[in-house]
């Protein structure tokens, strides 16, 4: 399709970018109910009704295969690659669904990450920063010391490590 840009897009497709920079998810699950906190599709139970996810979690039709949603926003200078993961439950052993603000568990948990990549002379660009969001808390990670806490709120004093050159470890 046409983007009505002055310069026609070139380089990798958005799918290729999302695959090339896809983070490696390390996710802790509670050992009393592993499946409750799996990363899966929003419609893992065969419907898009969200208020029945706890009831449908252990039904035979539940497909708990791993799914990560993604999108790419492109400017003339950068790619912003967004990744989102869904959990039927955000689960802990001490979960009390009647106290959702006191206990860290709830139904329908969506969290995510954004990888910011600067376009350069290489095919895949250069990593700039990683932003993650979980439970309404933003964390920003970078490897360039020029990006400072004065310029970036929520900056963590931890660098980003990668698997296979371009895959940030979360």
Q: Where are each of the predicted segments found?
A:
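A domain-level signal for the mature, folded cores of soluble proteins
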Residues: 3-113, 117-170
């Amino acid at each position: 399709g046409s983007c009505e840009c002055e310069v026609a897009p070139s380089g990798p497709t958005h799918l290729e970018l999302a695959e090339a920079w896809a983070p490696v998810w390390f996710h802790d699950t509670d050992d009393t109910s592993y499946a409750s906190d799996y990363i899966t599709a929003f419609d893992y139970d065969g419907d898009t009704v969200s208020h029945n996810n706890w009831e449908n979690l252990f039904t035979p039709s539940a497909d708990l295969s791993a799914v990560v949603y993604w999108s790419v926003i492109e400017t003339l200078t950068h790619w912003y690659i967004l990744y989102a993961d869904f959990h039927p439950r955000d689960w802990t052993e001490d979960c009390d669904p009647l106290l959702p603000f006191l206990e860290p568990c709830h139904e329908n948990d969506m969290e995510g990450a954004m990888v910011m990549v600067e376009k350069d002379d290489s095919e895949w660009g250069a990593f700039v920063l990683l932003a993650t969001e979980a439970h309404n808390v933003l964390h920003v990670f970078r490897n360039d010391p020029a990006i400072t806490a004065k310029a970036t709120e929520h900056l963590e004093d931890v660098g980003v490590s990668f698997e296979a050159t371009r895959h940030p470890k979360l």
